[in-house]
Amino acid sequence: MEVLYNSTRSKGTPVKASEAILKGLSDDGGLFVPDHIPALDKSLKELSEMTYQQVAYEVMKLFLTDFTEEELKTCIERAYDSKFDTDVIAPLVEAEGAYYLELFHGSTIAFKDMALSILPHLMITSARKNHIKNEIVILTATSGDTGKAALAGFANVEGTRIIVFYPKNGVSPIQEKQMVTQKGDNTFVVGIHGNFDDAQTGVKKIFSDKELAKEMDGKGFQFSSANSINIGRLVPQICYYVYSYATLLREGKIADGEKMNVVVPTGNFGNILAAFYAKNMGLPIAKLICASNDNKVLYDFFRTGTYDRNREFMLTSSPSMDILISSNLERLIYRIAGNDADKNRELMAALSGQGKYEISADMKAALADFYGNYANEAETADEIKRLYRSCGYVIDTHTAVASAVYQKYLKETGDSNTKTVIASTASPFKFTRSVMNAIDAKYDAMSDFELVDELSKIANVTVPQAIEEIRTAPVVHDTQCDADKMKDTVKEFLHI
Ligand SMILES: *Cc1c(COP(=O)(O)O)cnc(C)c1O
């Protein structure tokens, strides 16, 4: 059955998957959502016998219904290849009885690679299907990981250009180095004087600037988005939840149909929303455990039913989760409002006006599958140290937030029998200083690359290629701008 995509903010004409991917954001500023969530049409047993690529096809074909089998399989083959340093693409590592789903084996060693290695292929296929002649300009705001993963995905992809905005003082040194050393004539990286929310708001504003869109069209350009507001990012993220269950089943760790919990370190709410969609496709998931850092808007939301961004923005050791406006939550709000675009639009207007909104009791009741909690900086560091001491497994700061929240969940609920998958979203090599300092304060005196070698030793893991590459790479991007000058910067880059 065909899946069409509606905006979360108005009842316009639904669009096909390829059109939603090309546009990124709907014209009314809303996000595209599937008109229904398709059910898995392969049994769990069948899925458990498949490779990652095969599972990805079985999931994505159900959402991207206007892609032919050949188109989709080609995209999948090109995305999930030897760019990943393991054949299984997303390995499951057991530590202390929980299963860490390592989503960081792609070229930029964060989970964003899972979707951004396929998005460029989905995008150019969509452009071809829709007879688009314009060059596609990918505009991206990043809290650190999306930027590099999108740059790596789109670099030198014909018919595309990519512009990445990151908060100049809000990413880790390794994240910044990864971005500013990006090669490719079609890439452009800009540090903004502001935080991630400023970058994201600026990008959304540029997207909804109708005059600019017209001007761009005249010069042969059109915008699209590589942020997780693009449905072409969300759908590929559903696949690894299905694959993790398939792996547990294949390895005899779970019984066919037995439910598992999923813990997700959350920022923009894209990753956990993908898990929610997986559950709605029929994957046996019990609780969706949403883990936040000190920017605990989501924890407060799940507890009180009020989403309130009026608070201090905290810079933490898990920068990819330093977010006060979780964009993808809008897709969940729309759904629990009964797919009511008017209601959702009202709440989003309150969010942009007063910085907060409150959901009804009925809507709150529809969130029963979610459990929210958070870990502060000390708890996050302690969790890295605790897990390393107990079993030698080293996790990054984001994964540590999830792991610490899982410990809180266990304590609160006693639910230790349910098998639990913890999304491990970045390699510890990406946040080496925070990780090593958490393990022992003595490491603070070492340089970034000395720490990399030390981490390799204590974790008994070879240094990933992504880190080796930046040791000596020259800086090729040094543009900075104020948050309110983002549009001018874009125009300069495009020479319009
Ligand atoms: C992006 C990111 C997150 C947050 O994911 P969302 O989909 O934005 O909730 C968590 N951890 C890491 C390492 C990330 O890069």
What is the predicted function of each stretch?
Residues M1-I496:
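PLP-dependent amino-acid enzyme catalytic core
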